[in-house]
Amino acid sequence: MKKHINIKFGELFLKGKNKKEFIKALFKNVNKALSDFEFKLLDKHSMFTLEYCSEDENEIIHILKMIPGIHHFFLCLEAKTDIKEIAKVANGFDKKYKTFKIEVKRRYKEFLDQTEIKKEVATYILKNNEIKVDVHNPELTINIEIYDENKSYVWFDKILGVGGLPIGVNGRCLSLLSGGIDSPVASFLLQKRGQQVDYLTFITDDVTEITLNKLKSLIKQITLNYKIYKPRFFIVDFTKVQHELIHMSNEKYRITLMRRSFYRIAQQLAIKYKMNSLICGDSLGQVASQTIESINTISQVCDKMEIFRPLLTFDKVEIIEIAKQIGTYEISISEHEDVCSMFAPKHPITKPKLSIALALENELELLKSLEDRAVANVQIIKE
Protein backbone atom coordinates (compact mmCIF):
# COMPACT_ATOMS: atom_id res chain seq x y z
CA MET A 1 0.00 0.00 0.00
CA LYS A 2 1.59 3.24 -1.18
CA LYS A 3 1.43 6.50 0.78
CA HIS A 4 0.64 9.86 -0.75
CA ILE A 5 0.15 13.44 0.32
CA ASN A 6 -2.38 15.57 -1.53
CA ILE A 7 -1.39 19.25 -1.36
CA LYS A 8 -3.99 22.02 -1.73
CA PHE A 9 -3.20 25.63 -2.70
CA GLY A 10 -5.93 27.84 -1.24
CA GLU A 11 -5.31 31.49 -2.18
CA LEU A 12 -3.56 30.69 -5.48
CA PHE A 13 -6.92 30.00 -7.11
CA LEU A 14 -7.81 33.69 -6.75
CA LYS A 15 -5.01 34.77 -9.08
CA GLY A 16 -6.91 34.68 -12.38
CA LYS A 17 -4.65 34.73 -15.42
CA ASN A 18 -1.53 34.49 -13.22
CA LYS A 19 -2.72 31.32 -11.47
CA LYS A 20 -0.61 29.01 -13.65
CA GLU A 21 2.57 30.96 -12.90
CA PHE A 22 1.90 30.90 -9.15
CA ILE A 23 1.22 27.15 -9.18
CA LYS A 24 4.33 26.58 -11.29
CA ALA A 25 6.39 28.55 -8.74
CA LEU A 26 4.96 26.52 -5.84
CA PHE A 27 5.64 23.24 -7.68
CA LYS A 28 9.26 24.31 -8.13
CA ASN A 29 9.58 25.38 -4.48
CA VAL A 30 8.20 22.10 -3.12
CA ASN A 31 10.64 20.14 -5.28
CA LYS A 32 13.54 22.23 -3.96
CA ALA A 33 12.44 22.04 -0.32
CA LEU A 34 12.24 18.23 -0.44
CA SER A 35 15.40 17.69 -2.46
CA ASP A 36 17.02 15.60 0.32
CA PHE A 37 14.33 12.91 0.03
CA GLU A 38 13.17 10.33 -2.51
CA PHE A 39 9.77 11.42 -3.78
CA LYS A 40 7.64 12.05 -6.85
CA LEU A 41 5.55 15.22 -7.14
CA LEU A 42 2.67 15.30 -9.62
CA ASP A 43 0.74 18.41 -10.69
CA LYS A 44 -2.94 17.48 -10.91
CA HIS A 45 -4.21 21.02 -11.59
CA SER A 46 -6.39 21.37 -8.48
CA MET A 47 -3.69 19.95 -6.22
CA PHE A 48 -0.26 18.33 -6.09
CA THR A 49 0.12 14.66 -5.23
CA LEU A 50 3.33 13.69 -3.46
CA GLU A 51 4.43 10.04 -3.46
CA TYR A 52 7.02 9.38 -0.76
CA CYS A 53 8.78 6.80 1.41
CA SER A 54 6.99 6.23 4.70
CA GLU A 55 10.20 6.43 6.76
CA ASP A 56 10.59 10.10 5.72
CA GLU A 57 7.01 11.01 6.62
CA ASN A 58 7.58 13.09 9.77
CA GLU A 59 10.34 15.21 8.21
CA ILE A 60 8.35 15.75 5.00
CA ILE A 61 5.26 16.83 6.96
CA HIS A 62 7.35 19.32 8.97
CA ILE A 63 8.75 20.88 5.79
CA LEU A 64 5.40 21.05 3.97
CA LYS A 65 3.87 22.88 6.95
CA MET A 66 6.46 25.65 6.46
CA ILE A 67 6.29 26.18 2.67
CA PRO A 68 4.42 29.41 1.73
CA GLY A 69 1.67 28.80 -0.80
CA ILE A 70 0.45 25.53 0.72
CA HIS A 71 -2.90 26.01 2.43
CA HIS A 72 -3.37 22.44 3.68
CA PHE A 73 -2.56 18.86 2.82
CA PHE A 74 -3.76 15.32 3.49
CA LEU A 75 -1.90 12.11 4.22
CA CYS A 76 -3.53 9.71 1.79
CA LEU A 77 -3.65 5.94 1.56
CA GLU A 78 -3.95 4.39 -1.88
CA ALA A 79 -6.42 1.58 -2.53
CA LYS A 80 -7.53 -0.32 -5.59
CA THR A 81 -10.79 0.94 -7.04
CA ASP A 82 -12.65 -1.93 -5.45
CA ILE A 83 -15.27 -1.29 -2.79
CA LYS A 84 -14.01 -4.02 -0.43
CA GLU A 85 -10.45 -2.75 -0.71
CA ILE A 86 -11.56 0.85 -0.16
CA ALA A 87 -13.57 -0.15 2.93
CA LYS A 88 -10.59 -1.98 4.46
CA VAL A 89 -8.30 1.01 3.91
CA ALA A 90 -10.95 3.41 5.28
CA ASN A 91 -11.08 1.29 8.43
CA GLY A 92 -7.47 2.24 9.22
CA PHE A 93 -8.40 5.35 11.20
CA ASP A 94 -7.35 6.09 14.80
CA LYS A 95 -9.80 4.21 17.04
CA LYS A 96 -10.06 7.09 19.53
CA TYR A 97 -12.92 8.62 17.53
CA LYS A 98 -16.52 7.96 18.58
CA THR A 99 -18.43 9.49 15.64
CA PHE A 100 -17.75 9.75 11.90
CA LYS A 101 -19.08 10.62 8.50
CA ILE A 102 -17.90 9.80 4.99
CA GLU A 103 -17.26 12.24 2.14
CA VAL A 104 -16.86 10.93 -1.40
CA LYS A 105 -15.50 12.56 -4.55
CA ARG A 106 -15.64 10.70 -7.88
CA ARG A 107 -13.24 11.74 -10.61
CA TYR A 108 -13.82 8.37 -12.21
CA LYS A 109 -17.56 8.07 -12.80
CA GLU A 110 -17.74 4.48 -14.06
CA PHE A 111 -17.94 3.11 -10.53
CA LEU A 112 -20.52 3.02 -7.76
CA ASP A 113 -22.27 6.31 -7.09
CA GLN A 114 -21.59 8.36 -3.95
CA THR A 115 -24.53 6.95 -1.99
CA GLU A 116 -23.54 3.36 -2.69
CA ILE A 117 -19.90 4.00 -1.73
CA LYS A 118 -20.90 5.67 1.54
CA LYS A 119 -23.31 2.87 2.41
CA GLU A 120 -20.82 0.06 1.73
CA VAL A 121 -17.92 1.69 3.57
CA ALA A 122 -20.06 2.80 6.55
CA THR A 123 -21.51 -0.69 6.92
CA TYR A 124 -18.01 -2.19 7.07
CA ILE A 125 -16.80 0.38 9.62
CA LEU A 126 -19.87 0.03 11.87
CA LYS A 127 -19.51 -3.74 11.80
CA ASN A 128 -15.86 -3.61 12.89
CA ASN A 129 -15.82 -0.70 15.38
CA GLU A 130 -17.68 0.80 18.33
CA ILE A 131 -18.47 4.05 16.54
CA LYS A 132 -21.55 5.94 15.39
CA VAL A 133 -22.46 7.97 12.32
CA ASP A 134 -22.87 11.74 12.82
CA VAL A 135 -23.23 13.68 9.57
CA HIS A 136 -23.57 17.08 11.27
CA ASN A 137 -20.73 17.26 13.81
CA PRO A 138 -18.49 14.21 13.47
CA GLU A 139 -15.21 13.75 15.35
CA LEU A 140 -13.79 12.08 12.23
CA THR A 141 -14.36 12.66 8.52
CA ILE A 142 -13.28 9.83 6.22
CA ASN A 143 -12.54 11.21 2.75
CA ILE A 144 -12.62 8.94 -0.28
CA GLU A 145 -11.63 9.92 -3.80
CA ILE A 146 -12.29 7.55 -6.70
CA TYR A 147 -9.42 8.70 -8.89
CA ASP A 148 -9.53 6.30 -11.85
CA GLU A 149 -10.42 2.69 -12.67
CA ASN A 150 -7.27 1.42 -10.95
CA LYS A 151 -6.70 3.53 -7.86
CA SER A 152 -8.56 5.48 -5.22
CA TYR A 153 -7.42 7.58 -2.25
CA VAL A 154 -8.51 7.58 1.38
CA TRP A 155 -7.52 10.18 3.98
CA PHE A 156 -8.60 11.23 7.46
CA ASP A 157 -6.83 14.33 8.78
CA LYS A 158 -6.28 17.75 7.23
CA ILE A 159 -2.93 19.33 8.13
CA LEU A 160 -2.75 23.11 7.83
CA GLY A 161 0.14 24.81 6.05
CA VAL A 162 1.16 28.46 6.38
CA GLY A 163 -0.86 29.57 3.35
CA GLY A 164 0.17 32.72 1.52
CA LEU A 165 1.99 32.89 -1.81
CA PRO A 166 4.95 30.94 -3.22
CA ILE A 167 8.35 32.38 -2.35
CA GLY A 168 9.74 34.47 -5.19
CA VAL A 169 6.57 35.66 -6.92
CA ASN A 170 6.82 39.16 -5.35
CA GLY A 171 10.51 39.92 -5.80
CA ARG A 172 13.17 40.53 -3.12
CA CYS A 173 13.19 42.68 -0.01
CA LEU A 174 15.68 43.55 2.73
CA SER A 175 15.00 42.72 6.38
CA LEU A 176 16.69 44.56 9.25
CA LEU A 177 17.59 41.59 11.43
CA SER A 178 18.44 42.28 15.07
CA GLY A 179 18.60 38.81 16.56
CA GLY A 180 15.61 39.33 18.85
CA ILE A 181 12.20 37.67 18.62
CA ASP A 182 10.39 40.15 16.38
CA SER A 183 12.46 40.70 13.24
CA PRO A 184 12.74 36.98 12.31
CA VAL A 185 8.95 36.65 12.58
CA ALA A 186 8.45 39.77 10.44
CA SER A 187 10.84 38.32 7.86
CA PHE A 188 8.94 35.03 7.76
CA LEU A 189 5.61 36.82 7.28
CA LEU A 190 6.92 38.76 4.26
CA GLN A 191 8.43 35.56 2.89
CA LYS A 192 4.94 34.06 3.28
CA ARG A 193 3.64 36.79 0.94
CA GLY A 194 5.92 35.68 -1.88
CA GLN A 195 9.06 37.68 -1.12
CA GLN A 196 12.61 36.39 -1.22
CA VAL A 197 14.12 38.01 1.86
CA ASP A 198 17.70 39.22 2.16
CA TYR A 199 19.03 40.25 5.57
CA LEU A 200 20.90 43.23 7.01
CA THR A 201 22.48 43.56 10.43
CA PHE A 202 24.57 46.32 12.00
CA ILE A 203 27.60 45.46 14.09
CA THR A 204 30.12 47.33 16.23
CA ASP A 205 33.42 46.33 17.78
CA ASP A 206 31.51 44.74 20.68
CA VAL A 207 29.66 42.22 18.49
CA THR A 208 31.16 38.73 18.63
CA GLU A 209 31.27 35.79 16.24
CA ILE A 210 28.72 34.09 18.51
CA THR A 211 26.16 36.78 17.66
CA LEU A 212 26.83 36.53 13.92
CA ASN A 213 26.45 32.75 14.07
CA LYS A 214 23.15 33.23 15.88
CA LEU A 215 21.90 35.50 13.09
CA LYS A 216 23.00 32.97 10.47
CA SER A 217 21.07 30.27 12.35
CA LEU A 218 17.94 32.44 12.31
CA ILE A 219 18.26 33.03 8.57
CA LYS A 220 18.77 29.32 7.94
CA GLN A 221 15.66 28.47 9.96
CA ILE A 222 13.47 31.07 8.23
CA THR A 223 14.57 30.00 4.74
CA LEU A 224 14.10 26.23 5.25
CA ASN A 225 17.84 25.49 5.26
CA TYR A 226 18.35 27.58 2.10
CA LYS A 227 16.55 24.94 0.02
CA ILE A 228 14.15 27.20 -1.89
CA TYR A 229 16.45 30.20 -2.39
CA LYS A 230 19.81 31.54 -1.25
CA PRO A 231 19.43 34.74 0.81
CA ARG A 232 22.16 37.35 1.01
CA PHE A 233 23.34 38.46 4.45
CA PHE A 234 24.58 42.07 4.56
CA ILE A 235 26.78 43.01 7.53
CA VAL A 236 27.42 46.72 8.08
CA ASP A 237 30.09 47.94 10.50
CA PHE A 238 28.26 50.71 12.33
CA THR A 239 31.08 51.57 14.76
CA LYS A 240 32.18 54.89 13.26
CA VAL A 241 28.62 56.06 12.63
CA GLN A 242 27.76 55.24 16.23
CA HIS A 243 30.75 57.20 17.51
CA GLU A 244 29.60 60.20 15.48
CA LEU A 245 26.06 59.95 16.88
CA ILE A 246 27.42 60.18 20.44
CA HIS A 247 28.29 63.83 19.75
CA MET A 248 24.67 64.96 19.36
CA SER A 249 23.56 67.59 21.86
CA ASN A 250 20.37 65.80 22.99
CA GLU A 251 21.02 62.20 24.01
CA LYS A 252 17.29 61.45 24.33
CA TYR A 253 17.20 61.40 20.51
CA ARG A 254 20.08 58.93 20.28
CA ILE A 255 17.95 55.90 19.33
CA THR A 256 15.82 57.98 16.95
CA LEU A 257 18.86 59.20 15.03
CA MET A 258 20.48 55.80 15.08
CA ARG A 259 17.42 54.15 13.55
CA ARG A 260 17.15 56.92 10.95
CA SER A 261 20.74 56.11 10.07
CA PHE A 262 19.89 52.39 9.87
CA TYR A 263 17.13 53.07 7.36
CA ARG A 264 19.18 55.43 5.22
CA ILE A 265 21.87 52.77 4.93
CA ALA A 266 19.29 50.02 4.34
CA GLN A 267 17.60 51.99 1.57
CA GLN A 268 20.93 52.62 -0.17
CA LEU A 269 21.77 48.92 -0.05
CA ALA A 270 18.32 47.88 -1.23
CA ILE A 271 18.55 50.18 -4.24
CA LYS A 272 22.13 49.16 -5.05
CA TYR A 273 21.37 45.43 -4.85
CA LYS A 274 17.95 45.58 -6.51
CA MET A 275 15.52 44.93 -3.67
CA ASN A 276 12.06 46.49 -3.72
CA SER A 277 11.27 47.17 -0.04
CA LEU A 278 12.46 47.03 3.57
CA ILE A 279 11.15 44.93 6.49
CA CYS A 280 11.35 45.58 10.20
CA GLY A 281 9.83 43.98 13.29
CA ASP A 282 8.18 47.08 14.77
CA SER A 283 5.09 46.50 16.92
CA LEU A 284 3.18 49.71 17.64
CA GLY A 285 3.90 51.03 21.13
CA GLN A 286 6.10 48.12 22.21
CA VAL A 287 9.18 50.29 22.93
CA ALA A 288 10.11 53.98 22.72
CA SER A 289 11.23 53.77 19.09
CA GLN A 290 7.91 52.16 18.07
CA THR A 291 5.41 54.83 19.10
CA ILE A 292 3.55 56.34 16.17
CA GLU A 293 5.56 59.57 16.55
CA SER A 294 8.84 57.64 16.51
CA ILE A 295 7.80 55.55 13.51
CA ASN A 296 6.83 58.68 11.56
CA THR A 297 10.06 60.50 12.39
CA ILE A 298 12.25 57.49 11.62
CA SER A 299 10.43 56.47 8.42
CA GLN A 300 10.82 59.95 6.91
CA VAL A 301 14.32 59.03 5.67
CA CYS A 302 12.96 56.31 3.35
CA ASP A 303 11.58 58.21 0.39
CA LYS A 304 12.26 55.68 -2.38
CA MET A 305 10.63 52.49 -1.11
CA GLU A 306 8.14 51.08 1.35
CA ILE A 307 8.99 49.89 4.85
CA PHE A 308 6.83 46.87 5.68
CA ARG A 309 5.95 46.30 9.34
CA PRO A 310 3.92 43.07 9.38
CA LEU A 311 3.89 42.93 13.21
CA LEU A 312 2.55 46.45 13.71
CA THR A 313 -0.73 45.33 15.34
CA PHE A 314 0.55 42.15 17.01
CA ASP A 315 1.12 41.95 20.75
CA LYS A 316 4.18 40.20 22.19
CA VAL A 317 2.32 37.00 23.05
CA GLU A 318 1.13 36.62 19.46
CA ILE A 319 4.64 37.27 18.11
CA ILE A 320 6.16 34.71 20.46
CA GLU A 321 3.57 32.12 19.42
CA ILE A 322 4.48 32.54 15.75
CA ALA A 323 8.19 32.43 16.60
CA LYS A 324 7.65 29.08 18.31
CA GLN A 325 5.66 27.75 15.36
CA ILE A 326 8.36 28.64 12.82
CA GLY A 327 11.24 27.48 15.01
CA THR A 328 12.99 30.82 15.63
CA TYR A 329 12.02 31.41 19.26
CA GLU A 330 14.68 29.29 20.97
CA ILE A 331 17.37 30.78 18.74
CA SER A 332 16.16 34.33 19.37
CA ILE A 333 16.21 34.10 23.16
CA SER A 334 19.83 32.96 23.30
CA GLU A 335 22.23 35.70 24.42
CA HIS A 336 23.61 38.18 21.89
CA GLU A 337 24.94 41.73 21.65
CA ASP A 338 22.45 44.20 20.23
CA VAL A 339 23.59 47.55 18.84
CA CYS A 340 20.38 49.31 19.90
CA SER A 341 20.40 48.13 23.52
CA MET A 342 24.10 48.92 23.97
CA PHE A 343 23.56 52.46 22.63
CA ALA A 344 20.24 53.31 24.30
CA PRO A 345 20.06 56.28 26.70
CA LYS A 346 18.38 55.89 30.09
CA HIS A 347 15.37 57.95 29.03
CA PRO A 348 14.82 57.79 25.24
CA ILE A 349 12.35 60.19 23.67
CA THR A 350 8.96 58.58 22.99
CA LYS A 351 7.46 61.36 20.87
CA PRO A 352 10.35 62.71 18.80
CA LYS A 353 9.78 65.70 16.53
CA LEU A 354 11.10 65.54 12.98
CA SER A 355 12.33 69.14 13.12
CA ILE A 356 14.49 68.40 16.17
CA ALA A 357 15.84 65.17 14.63
CA LEU A 358 16.86 67.08 11.49
CA ALA A 359 18.50 69.82 13.54
CA LEU A 360 20.48 67.28 15.55
CA GLU A 361 21.66 65.55 12.36
CA ASN A 362 22.86 68.90 11.04
CA GLU A 363 25.18 69.09 14.07
CA LEU A 364 26.95 65.93 12.90
CA GLU A 365 29.11 67.03 9.98
CA LEU A 366 30.58 63.58 9.30
CA LEU A 367 27.34 61.59 9.52
CA LYS A 368 26.50 61.32 5.82
CA SER A 369 30.05 60.50 4.72
CA LEU A 370 30.34 57.83 7.41
CA GLU A 371 27.04 56.29 6.34
CA ASP A 372 28.19 56.25 2.71
CA ARG A 373 31.44 54.61 3.76
CA ALA A 374 29.52 51.97 5.73
CA VAL A 375 27.53 51.15 2.60
CA ALA A 376 30.65 50.97 0.46
CA ASN A 377 32.37 48.62 2.92
CA VAL A 378 29.43 46.29 3.51
CA GLN A 379 30.25 42.62 3.89
CA ILE A 380 27.97 40.26 1.95
CA ILE A 381 27.65 36.60 2.87
CA LYS A 382 26.01 34.25 0.37
CA GLU A 383 25.14 30.80 1.64
Swiss-Prot record:
Localisation? Cytoplasm
Q: A single GO molecular function, which one?
A: CCA tRNA nucleotidyltransferase activity
Query: Do you know which InterPro entries this protein is assigned to?
Result: Rossmann-like_a/b/a_fold, ThiI_AANH, ThiI_fer, ThiI_N, THUMP_dom, THUMP_ThiI, tRNA_STrfase, tRNA_sulfurtransferase_ThiI
User: What is one Gene Ontology biological process annotated in the Swiss-Prot or TrEMBL record?
Assistant: tRNA 4-thiouridine biosynthesis
Cellular component per GO?
cytosol
Residues given in the record as ATP binding sites: 176-177, 201-202, 259, 281, 290
Which Pfam families does this entry report, sorted A to Z?
Answer: ThiI, ThiI_fer, THUMP
Q: Where is the THUMP domain?
A: 58-158
The protein's Enzyme Commission number: 2.8.1.4
Q: What is its main location?
A: cytoplasm
What UniProt keywords are attached to this protein's entry?
ATP-binding, Cytoplasm, Nucleotide-binding, RNA-binding, Thiamine biosynthesis, Transferase, tRNA-binding
Q: Which reaction does it catalyse?
A: [ThiI sulfur-carrier protein]-S-sulfanyl-L-cysteine + a uridine in tRNA + 2 reduced [2Fe-2S]-[ferredoxin] + ATP + H(+) = [ThiI sulfur-carrier protein]-L-cysteine + a 4-thiouridine in tRNA + 2 oxidized [2Fe-2S]-[ferredoxin] + AMP + diphosphate; [ThiS sulfur-carrier protein]-C-terminal Gly-Gly-AMP + S-sulfanyl-L-cysteinyl-[cysteine desulfurase] + AH2 = [ThiS sulfur-carrier protein]-C-terminal-Gly-aminoethanethioate + L-cysteinyl-[cysteine desulfurase] + A + AMP + 2 H(+)
Pathway listed: Cofactor biosynthesis; thiamine diphosphate biosynthesis
What start-end ranges are recorded for coiled-coil regions in this protein? none
HAMAP family of this UniProt entry? Answer: ThiI
Q: Which PANTHER family match?
A: TRNA SULFURTRANSFERASE
Instruction: State the family named in the UniProt similarity comment for this chain.
Output: Belongs to the ThiI family.
Q: What does this protein do?
A: Catalyzes the ATP-dependent transfer of a sulfur to tRNA to produce 4-thiouridine in position 8 of tRNAs, which functions as a near-UV photosensor. Also catalyzes the transfer of sulfur to the sulfur carrier protein ThiS, forming ThiS-thiocarboxylate. This is a step in the synthesis of thiazole, in the thiamine biosynthesis pathway. The sulfur is donated as persulfide by IscS.
- What is this protein called in UniProt? Probable tRNA sulfurtransferase
Source species, please?
A: Malacoplasma penetrans (strain HF-2)
Q: According to the entry, what is the taxonomic lineage of the organism?
A: Bacteria, Bacillati, Mycoplasmatota, Mycoplasmoidales, Mycoplasmoidaceae
Q: Which gene encodes it?
A: thiI
